[in-house]
């Protein structure tokens, strides 16, 4: 059982480290959105909600899954350098506002990104010390196709495009820090949680360590 004191100590330590960007990426249908939802249940990660110009699906809520905007508005923000990353995917634009990311990281909170390879590459280039990336693979192409059809929210043309782009996405697997084959959902969640927890205690992120250790060394024992 976690005590009140332990919670307070954890909060103080969190405020003395910079947050990082925890990226989940995968071909469409490999499971990154489902995995993201399960990870967010712990309350340790804050979801980065992207802006997009694509049409809202029946199951989606504006402001919860995405911020849905027009192409004209997206291009205005893009040209004003408001995005820390943006990409054109399946003919639509997706992007993350720079200001929202910096506001969260400065408080020691970590952000979860559900983005494609294009967005991942931009974040890795612009914030190399602040990114941890995980690539999710399907167990087979047959299973990937099955998942896309079970979702039943895209036309046949869109499904064909997603399958074509999936093979391109998978060619970039070496660009990620970690790679997981999502055959068993519970096992995949467990692996990703382990990766996340290990990354939170990396020495270079924990600003509190140096004064804490200096205090330990200087501490007098009666």
Swiss-Prot record:
Any one cellular-component term (Gene Ontology): cytosol
Domain of life: Bacteria
InterPro entries: GK/Ca_channel_bsu, Guanylate_kin-like_dom, Guanylate_kinase, Guanylate_kinase_CS, P-loop_NTPase
Compartments in which it is found: Cytoplasm
EC number(s) given by UniProt: 2.7.4.8
Protein keywords: ATP-binding, Cytoplasm, Kinase, Nucleotide-binding, Transferase
Catalytic activity of the protein: GMP + ATP = GDP + ADP
Keyword ATP-binding: yes
Binding site for ATP: 26-33
Pfam families per UniProt: Guanylate_kin (PF00625)
Family membership noted in the UniProt record: Belongs to the guanylate kinase family.
This protein's name: Guanylate kinase
Higher taxonomy: Bacteria, Pseudomonadati, Pseudomonadota, Alphaproteobacteria, Hyphomicrobiales
């Amino acid at each position: 059982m976690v005590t009140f004191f332990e919670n307070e100590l954890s909060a103080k330590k969190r405020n003395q480290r910079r947050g990082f960007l925890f990226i989940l990426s995968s071909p469409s249908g490999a499971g990154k959105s489902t995995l993201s939802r399960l990870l967010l249940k712990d309350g340790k990660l804050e979801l980065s909600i992207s802006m997009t110009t694509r049409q809202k699906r029946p199951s989606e809520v504006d402001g919860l899954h995405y911020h849905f905007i027009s192409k004209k508005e997206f291009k205005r923000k893009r040209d004003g350098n408001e995005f820390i990353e943006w990409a054109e995917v399946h003919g639509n634009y997706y992007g993350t506002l720079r200001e929202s990311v910096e506001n969260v990281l400065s408080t020691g909170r970590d952000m979860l990104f559900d983005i494609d390879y294009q967005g991942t590459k931009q974040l890795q280039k612009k914030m190399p010390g602040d990114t941890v990336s995980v690539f999710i693979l399907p167990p087979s192409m047959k299973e990937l196709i099955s998942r896309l059809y079970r979702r039943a929210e895209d036309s046949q043309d869109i499904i064909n495009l997603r399958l074509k782009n999936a093979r391109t996405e998978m060619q970039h697997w070496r660009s990620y820090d970690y790679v997981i084959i999502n055959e068993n959902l519970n096992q995949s969640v467990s692996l990703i949680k382990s990766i996340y927890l290990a990354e939170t205690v990396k020495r270079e992120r924990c600003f509190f360590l140096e004064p804490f250790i200096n205090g330990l060394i200087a501490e007098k024992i009666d």
